[in-house]
């Protein structure tokens, strides 16, 4: 593969500086990311809406063509197994996205339900993960850049709203452009046929030079989403977490005519106990201390009552932040807890942290509309 010694950072400090620069570029100007790895499932048929309403916890029957919606998927026990955004192409056609690691298992699970339990539904599934490339354009200046790249779409805020999509032509290539965001910033995801992926990437990079566009990767993305309190299934959940455990009661439909997978399990008393682990934020008293992920939260008897799921230094906030699962966590917001960590050459140490909301940045969600 040749000599690529100059293409990687040489120290932990260099790595952290790179992440910082990329996060700040996204928050203050514009960044771009290859989001092609997300799973994609094409859902078609007269009962496509009904199918989505059964596999997701929220409602899909009234989602208009041209719109997108975030969905949470549970198993029969009511535990979160995946999440993603699905796009309504027309009344009988949707494109579902899944987590990168969950693409194959979600597709297999959906086929199992369709073939063994709901064979009466007119629905056809196709895995299209490899058929599309996705370039995410993210940051306050994203709208300005998209106007340069695509002249046949009206990108004004009132005409292209958050969680909508539009067909258009980007640098001469047919594309579906979704206005969705995993950073909390104004963002557009350009979806094109896979063989045009590199070409569109280069065109976006070239057009964005006037705003010092900065490519960023998974590590920076993790920081950005944690600042907004967005979960990653499999990192902030562990197969035993319900939507309520991660503060997402709002995504549980109350009036669906047909129950969705996992709905009946939510009536089990054990899943409604205040003693369950709940998603919270942690703010270290020493703002420069970044808690190791997996560290245990201990009570005054030294027993574990939770653990750190995600932990980063936030460049925009100038301090460390962490997400954690804490027993009865929501009732402890504002209180001080201890996190036990292992320090190299120093042994065990207990770090005092304040329990906080899991949303650290732009709590009101104003940044998603970007600059005028």
Regions found by a protein language model. Give the residues of each.
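Short, solvent-exposed secondary-structure boundary motifs
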Residues: 2, 23, 71-79, 166-171
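Short beta-strand/turn micro-motifs at beta-sheet edges
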Residues: 27, 83-84, 178
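Conserved, structured C-terminal
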Residues: 13, 89-372
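Short loop/turn microsegments at loop-to-beta-strand junctions
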Residues: 6-7, 69, 292-294
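Acidic, proline/glycine-enriched N-terminal capping motif
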Residues: 13-16, 20-71, 79
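Single conserved hydrophobic/aromatic residue that forms the stacking wall/gate
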Residues: 1-15, 19
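Well-ordered mid-protein domain cores that form the structural environment of catalytic cofactors
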Residues: 58-113
């Amino acid at each position: 593969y040749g000599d690529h010694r100059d293409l990687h950072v040489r120290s932990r400090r260099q790595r952290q500086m790179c992440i910082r620069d990329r996060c700040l570029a996204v928050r203050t100007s514009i960044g771009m990311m290859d989001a092609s790895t997300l799973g994609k499932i094409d859902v078609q048929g007269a009962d496509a809406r009904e199918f989505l309403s059964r596999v997701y916890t929220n409602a899909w029957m009234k989602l208009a063509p041209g719109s997108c919606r975030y969905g949470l998927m549970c198993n029969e026990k009511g535990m979160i197994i995946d999440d993603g955004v699905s796009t309504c192409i027309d009344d009988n056609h949707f494109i579902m996205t899944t987590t990168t690691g969950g693409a194959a298992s979600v597709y297999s699970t959906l086929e199992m339900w369709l073939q063994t339990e709901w064979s009466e539904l007119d629905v056809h599934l196709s895995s299209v993960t490899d058929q599309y490339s996705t370039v995410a354009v993210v940051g306050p200046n994203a709208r300005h850049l998209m106007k340069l790249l695509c002249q046949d779409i009206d990108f004004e805020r009132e005409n292209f709203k958050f969680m909508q999509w539009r067909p258009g032509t980007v640098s001469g290539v047919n594309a579906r452009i979704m206005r969705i965001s995993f950073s909390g910033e104004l963002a557009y995801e350009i979806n094109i046929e896979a063989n045009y992926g590199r070409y569109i990437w280069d065109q976006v990079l070239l057009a964005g030079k006037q705003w010092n566009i900065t490519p960023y990767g998974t590590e920076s993305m993790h920081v950005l989403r944690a600042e907004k309190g967005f979960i990653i299934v499999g990192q902030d959940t562990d197969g035993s977490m319900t939507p309520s455990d991660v503060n997402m009661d709002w995504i549980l439909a109350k009036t669906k005519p047909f129950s969705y997978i996992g709905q009946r399990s939510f009536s089990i008393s054990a899943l409604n106990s205040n003693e369950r682990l709940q998603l919270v934020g942690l703010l270290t008293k020493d703002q420069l201390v970044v808690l190791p992920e997996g560290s245990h939260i201990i009570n005054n008897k030294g027993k574990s009552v939770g653990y750190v799921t995600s932990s980063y230094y936030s460049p925009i906030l100038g301090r460390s932040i962490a997400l954690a699962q804490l027993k009865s966590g929501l009732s402890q917001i504002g209180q001080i807890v201890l996190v036990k960590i292992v320090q190299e050459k120093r042994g065990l140490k207990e770090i005092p942290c304040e329990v906080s909301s899991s949303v650290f940045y732009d709590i009101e969600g104003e940044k998603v509309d970007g600059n005028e």
